[in-house]
UniProtKB/Swiss-Prot annotation:
Protein role: Catalyzes the phosphorylation of pantothenate (Pan), the first step in CoA biosynthesis.
Lineage of producing organism: Bacteria, Pseudomonadati, Thermodesulfobacteriota, Desulfuromonadia, Geobacterales
Pathway: Cofactor biosynthesis; coenzyme A biosynthesis; CoA from (R)-pantothenate: step 1/5
Family the entry assigns: Belongs to the type III pantothenate kinase family.
Documented EC number(s): 2.7.1.33
Residue positions binding substrate: Y100, G107, A108, D109, R110, T184
Species in which this protein is naturally found: Geobacter sp. (strain M21)
Manner of cofactor binding, per the entry note: A monovalent cation. Ammonium or potassium.
Primary localisation category: cytoplasm
Full protein name: Type III pantothenate kinase
Keywords: ATP-binding, Coenzyme A biosynthesis, Cytoplasm, Kinase, Metal-binding, Nucleotide-binding, Potassium, Transferase
UniProt record, GO biological process: coenzyme A biosynthetic process
Gene that this sequence comes from: coaX
Recorded GO MF terms: ATP binding; metal ion binding; pantothenate kinase activity
């Protein structure tokens, strides 16, 4: 079995693959203060509930945008699984040309998504990933990563409103009943939710205009299923895109 680990600023997503089949996945909160042993116990408990033991895992690949946790999970892999993991970054074969001023600056998760998207759809793509930040990535018809855009995520935007406006409460991210809201909570939700839908559609439409390839637009990430139904540009939600990308990169580096 293959263990794939996607480390984001807010969540760590784990997946277990048996060949090409995703047999189990988990999403846990990212905690930079946790030690190797604390993460080891967490992994053990998750695996035990799924009737999986550490020795079932024969290989590990990690994608991380949190440098401090990259090292922790590398050490965990060696200590608990007795495996030297693959880490997405310089030296890893991706099979995708990266057209960026400094390719090392592109987040590992963005490249992983691009690889998975092109492998699956074989056409020009815009990939919208709803994470701590929301990223927009363009892949052309030749399967080349062309760049993209980064915007503050939904949760960051809502938290900033609460932190900076003293009379506004902290509220959940949700679709309100109407854009013309009748109370403060719904008003905040209306501004963030519908404003974000507009942001997504606006950026995607501008990218389509520049790219001129009629790209397919897919969304992934924790909040993709919330925004996608209201979007006029998102065509499909692929919640396991990043995990699938890690599996593909592992295959290309075996």
């Amino acid at each position: 079995m293959l263990l794939v680990i996607d480390v984001g600023n807010s969540n760590i997503v784990l997946g277990i693959y048996d060949e090409e089949r995703l047999v189990r996945d988990w999403r846990v909160s990212t905690d930079k203060s946790k030690t190797i042993d604390e993460y080891g116990i967490l992994f053990h408990d998750l695996f035990r509930l799924a009737d999986i033991v550490f020795t079932d895992v024969k290989d590990i690949i990690i994608s991380s945008v949190v440098p401090t946790l990259t090292g922790v999970l590398e050490k965990l892999s060696r200590q608990y699984f007795k495996i030297s993991p693959y880490v997405v970054g310089p030296g890893i074969k991706t099979g995708m040309p990266i057209h960026y001023d400094n390719p090392k600056e592109v987040g590992a998760d963005r490249i992983v998504n691009a690889i998975a998207g092109f492998e699956k759809y074989r056409t020009a793509l815009i990939i919208v990933d709803f994470g701590t930040a929301t990223t927009f990535d363009y892949v052309n018809k030749k399967g080349e990563y062309c760049g993209g855009a980064i915007a503050p995520g939904l949760a960051i935007s809502m938290e900033a409103l609460f932190m900076k406006a003293s009379k506004l409460p902290r509220v959940d991210i949700a679709r309100p009943p109407s854009i013309i809201a009748k109370n403060t909570v719904n008003s905040m939700q209306a501004g963030i939710f519908f404003g974000y839908v507009g942001l997504v559609d606006g950026i995607v439409q501008r990218m389509k205009g520049e790219g001129k390839e009629n790209p397919k637009v897919i969304a992934t990430g924790g909040l993709a299923s919330l925004i996608a139904p209201e979007s006029v540009t998102i065509e499909e939600v692929d919640e396991f895109l990043t995990l699938e990308g890690l599996r593909i990169i592992h295959q290309r580096n075996k």
